[in-house]
Amino acid sequence: MEEPHSDLSIEPPLSQETFSDLWKLLPENNVLSDSLSPPMDHLLLSPEEVASWLGENPDGDGHVSAAPVSEAPTSAGPALVAPAPATSWPLSSSVPSHKPYRGSYGFEVHFLKSGTAKSVTCTYSPGLNKLFCQLAKTCPVQVWVESPPPPGTRVRALAIYKKSQHMTEVVRRCPHHERCSDSDGLAPPQHLIRVEGNLHAEYVDDRTTFRHSVVVPYEPPEVGSDCTTIHYNYMCNSSCMGGMNRRPILTIITLEDSSGKLLGRDSFEVRVCACPGRDRRTEEENFRKKGGLCPEPTPGNIKRALPTSTSSSPQPKKKPLDAEYFTLKIRGRKNFEILREINEALEFKDAQTEKEPGESRPHSSYPKSKKGQSTSCHKKLMFKREGLDSD
């Protein structure tokens, strides 16, 4: 028991003594003095040096302002709550004109003649001045000029809403189609109109009007051709929610010089749908019912109009028979017999024409074994009866 007491008298190890000495060196409240922490201000850059190093003025008023840490969450809070719809759906400050303008070069836009079959992917209605096409399908548009425009001329395609209450909104694709991986590497995902097979196409986002357009250089017609054809694609359906949302749109095609001066303008309505032929027939029929001018007929429309004309053809045959009698003097027995047979045949034909709808039903009700015999006897009896009546 005495050995432990003797151990207490032994001095602590060197490490413990060093720790205790260091602990005594600390000031009160465990705060280091200024002598132990030299100032670090000489290591910081001045505001002028920061501005010159960045090469630009972040605030735009000549000084660099420090963002307090306490204000960061307050400024970020409202940004998360407010969706800022103006940036996603901007309103244009101006509405471009869509009135046709041929200009001094006789600029016009034409389309190929097409029918209304179910298999068509693009069809144009001249009476409606409307193009019906499928999503992302080729739409050839012919550009006609009477005289060659100056070098550097460009052709621009721009889409706007047709109705006045929607004209200030920018036409763009719906969010679903914007996220689709169908980009060709040139067109931005929000652009509705694209140019197919032209590497010189330029897609423009106007910073003033926020509208989207696509510009291609004007190319003169090839040898043996009178026009230049541009192939456009429409990358969103007219019925897409969040996009056009069943609102009709117009496509404006303009001819511009190298400085952007307008040389010519033309426009047409566009409907992007799943069945262009069916929708064209429906709208043309509705247009006719409202008293509008009939559009130019197409082979498909002519074929569909034939059954209506054949169904109304039996109506002239239902005219009442002529009941007036005439007396004819004939010389010679042989001539009389010939004319009598002709007269009986004509009267039999008139009787069959008048009774044809009603007689077809009782004939079909006879048994198959006696059908041929009964009809032949019936005709002979009628023929004899008609002959007696004629005499």
Swiss-Prot record:
Residue ranges the UniProt entry marks as DNA-binding: 100-290
Region (Interaction with USP7): 357-361
Record-listed cross-link Glycyl lysine isopeptide (Lys-Gly) (interchain with G-Cter in SUMO), residues: K384
Residue numbers carrying Omega-N-methylarginine: R331
Residues covered by region (Interaction with CCAR2): 1-318
Region annotation (Disordered) ranges: 53-78, 284-320, 347-391
List of residues that carry Symmetric dimethylarginine: R333
Motif [KR]-[STA]-K motif, residue range(s) on this chain: 368-370
Residue(s) of cross-link: Glycyl lysine isopeptide (Lys-Gly) (interchain with G-Cter in ubiquitin): K24, K289, K290, K349, K355
GO process annotations (BP): cellular senescence; circadian behavior; DNA damage response; entrainment of circadian clock by photoperiod; negative regulation of cell growth; negative regulation of DNA-templated transcription; nucleotide-excision repair; oligodendrocyte apoptotic process
Entry keywords, A to Z: Acetylation, Activator, Apoptosis, Biological rhythms, Cell cycle, Cytoplasm, Cytoskeleton, DNA-binding, Endoplasmic reticulum, Isopeptide bond, Metal-binding, Methylation, Mitochondrion, Necrosis, Nucleus, Phosphoprotein, Repressor, Transcription, Transcription regulation, Tumor suppressor, Ubl conjugation, Zinc
Location of the protein in the cell: Cytoplasm; Nucleus; Nucleus, PML body; Endoplasmic reticulum
Modification sites for N6,N6-dimethyllysine: K368, K371, K380
Complex formation: Forms homodimers and homotetramers. Binds DNA as a homotetramer. Interacts with AXIN1. Probably part of a complex consisting of TP53, HIPK2 and AXIN1. Interacts with histone acetyltransferases EP300 and methyltransferases HRMT1L2 and CARM1, and recruits them to promoters. Interacts (via C-terminus) with TAF1; when TAF1 is part of the TFIID complex. Interacts with ING4; this interaction may be indirect. Found in a complex with CABLES1 and TP73. Interacts with HIPK1, HIPK2, and TP53INP1. Interacts with WWOX. Interacts with USP7 and SYVN1. Interacts with HSP90AB1.
Database matches in PANTHER family: CELLULAR TUMOR ANTIGEN P53
Function noted in UniProt: Multifunctional transcription factor that induces cell cycle arrest, DNA repair or apoptosis upon binding to its target DNA sequence. Acts as a tumor suppressor in many tumor types; induces growth arrest or apoptosis depending on the physiological circumstances and cell type. Negatively regulates cell division by controlling expression of a set of genes required for this process. One of the activated genes is an inhibitor of cyclin-dependent kinases. Apoptosis induction seems to be mediated either by stimulation of BAX and FAS antigen expression, or by repression of Bcl-2 expression.
Name of this protein: Cellular tumor antigen p53
Protein species of origin: Cavia porcellus
Gene of this entry: TP53
